């Protein structure tokens, strides 16, 4: 096992964890920003990939849980009981705190009032989604999440809506995303990165079986649980392809997008398939080990220039990395998708992963090298400040605001609507949004099935609902046109 100093550096000219001269690590979601050196005596996270710089505790999570637990236990006797036939809605949850902000939604921690289970709740403002042409993406993500469940995914439990927002309630993972830990200058060991590669390999293998290309695998979209296991999230630009089909749309985050996506967009051709997600895993793994990505690509780069870049620039590997890890990264970062490592079988055959107990891994019986500090909530505390101070429609004031809006709408002549188009879109979303309850679905699957009665004879043929039409996800159609992303 190498020291933390060895794991970042590649030469004496650059300090460990620093980009080469003239290549500063960019800020923002595409890449982590450098932080000042740690103060003396600052705590270090337990890891074979340790931490150089840890911030002061943002949130005493264990104390908060203890305090909330005592107050909630007193209320357990009067815990609400919701009608099982009633659709889940906003009133079924207690909002605890804001923890994040996505591409077009926000995330908070919630507790379901009847079961006291904790979840993360993502909510997206309908009007903003319409204005940003994101309605189709939200509906596609819902369609996908309602059909999948895996140990290394962030799984959907409930979806519902109100007049303002669409809600997705998912697994709560308290370990933070890998982008956050990169920004905290966590030095990930090879063993830790190997585990992430394996866990993502199992997730991608499952998604392939469901005909799903994620298209946005990156540190921002990989969340850790309290024990340090990795889970893939954010399916808002994922796509479903049938056997033999290829995707063609330019979709993803540029620094993590595979060369064939750019090539397909610029030169046409046959498109791309599941191999693109494995390239992204390679970029992510390289970044976790070195602190910056293998290619100097940013969102501002022209697509045409990126096609040229992959044929002219070679990836540089750190001499201190093991030859097995370098070989694994080379296979993941192979420009030609036909020669790229891009299946679970390929990964399992890699020498770098020869000792992995895959059965134990799929049951989370392999202990991660990096375990997030349980005394902190691993997110930016400004999210909660923004929600409380800057947000014009804060979630904690929703009930009062909706009641006020309802009263105002009832007193106004509907024929004087300022924006008929917007209202038509909102009405279409209200009608087409799919409500989902995985908890109820699991209960119904566990019930013993009674034998079906013999069908009665019918004098006249009854119309039969078309199966494809029944299973198709309704969209806003011509009212709220959104670009597809095949």
Swiss-Prot record:
<comment type="similarity">
    <text>Belongs to the protein kinase superfamily. Ser/Thr protein kinase family.</text>
</comment>
<keyword id="KW-0418">Kinase</keyword>
<dbReference type="Pfam" id="PF00069">
    <property type="entry name" value="Pkinase"/>
</dbReference>
<feature type="compositionally biased region" description="Low complexity">
    <location>
        <begin position="24"/>
        <end position="33"/>
    </location>
</feature>
<dbReference type="InterPro" id="IPR017441">
    <property type="entry name" value="Protein_kinase_ATP_BS"/>
</dbReference>
<feature type="region of interest" description="Disordered">
    <location>
        <begin position="1"/>
        <end position="56"/>
    </location>
</feature>
<keyword id="KW-0808">Transferase</keyword>
<feature type="region of interest" description="Disordered">
    <location>
        <begin position="444"/>
        <end position="486"/>
    </location>
</feature>
<feature type="binding site">
    <location>
        <position position="122"/>
    </location>
    <ligand>
        <name>ATP</name>
    </ligand>
</feature>
<keyword id="KW-0479">Metal-binding</keyword>
<dbReference type="GO" id="GO:0005524">
    <property type="term" value="F:ATP binding"/>
</dbReference>
<dbReference type="InterPro" id="IPR000719">
    <property type="entry name" value="Prot_kinase_dom"/>
</dbReference>
<keyword id="KW-0723">Serine/threonine-protein kinase</keyword>
<keyword id="KW-0067">ATP-binding</keyword>
<feature type="active site" description="Proton acceptor">
    <location>
        <position position="216"/>
    </location>
</feature>
<keyword id="KW-0597">Phosphoprotein</keyword>
<dbReference type="InterPro" id="IPR008271">
    <property type="entry name" value="Ser/Thr_kinase_AS"/>
</dbReference>
<feature type="domain" description="Protein kinase">
    <location>
        <begin position="93"/>
        <end position="353"/>
    </location>
</feature>
<dbReference type="GO" id="GO:0046872">
    <property type="term" value="F:metal ion binding"/>
</dbReference>
<feature type="binding site">
    <location>
        <begin position="99"/>
        <end position="107"/>
    </location>
    <ligand>
        <name>ATP</name>
    </ligand>
</feature>
<feature type="modified residue" description="Phosphoserine">
    <location>
        <position position="10"/>
    </location>
</feature>
<keyword id="KW-0460">Magnesium</keyword>
<dbReference type="GO" id="GO:0035556">
    <property type="term" value="P:intracellular signal transduction"/>
</dbReference>
<feature type="compositionally biased region" description="Basic residues">
    <location>
        <begin position="396"/>
        <end position="405"/>
    </location>
</feature>
<dbReference type="GO" id="GO:0004674">
    <property type="term" value="F:protein serine/threonine kinase activity"/>
</dbReference>
<feature type="modified residue" description="Phosphoserine">
    <location>
        <position position="15"/>
    </location>
</feature>
<dbReference type="GO" id="GO:0106310">
    <property type="term" value="F:protein serine kinase activity"/>
</dbReference>
<dbReference type="InterPro" id="IPR011009">
    <property type="entry name" value="Kinase-like_dom_sf"/>
</dbReference>
<keyword id="KW-0547">Nucleotide-binding</keyword>
<feature type="region of interest" description="Disordered">
    <location>
        <begin position="396"/>
        <end position="419"/>
    </location>
</feature>
<feature type="modified residue" description="Phosphoserine">
    <location>
        <position position="18"/>
    </location>
</feature>
<protein>
    <recommendedName>
        <fullName>Serine/threonine-protein kinase 32C</fullName>
        <ecNumber>2.7.11.1</ecNumber>
    </recommendedName>
</protein>
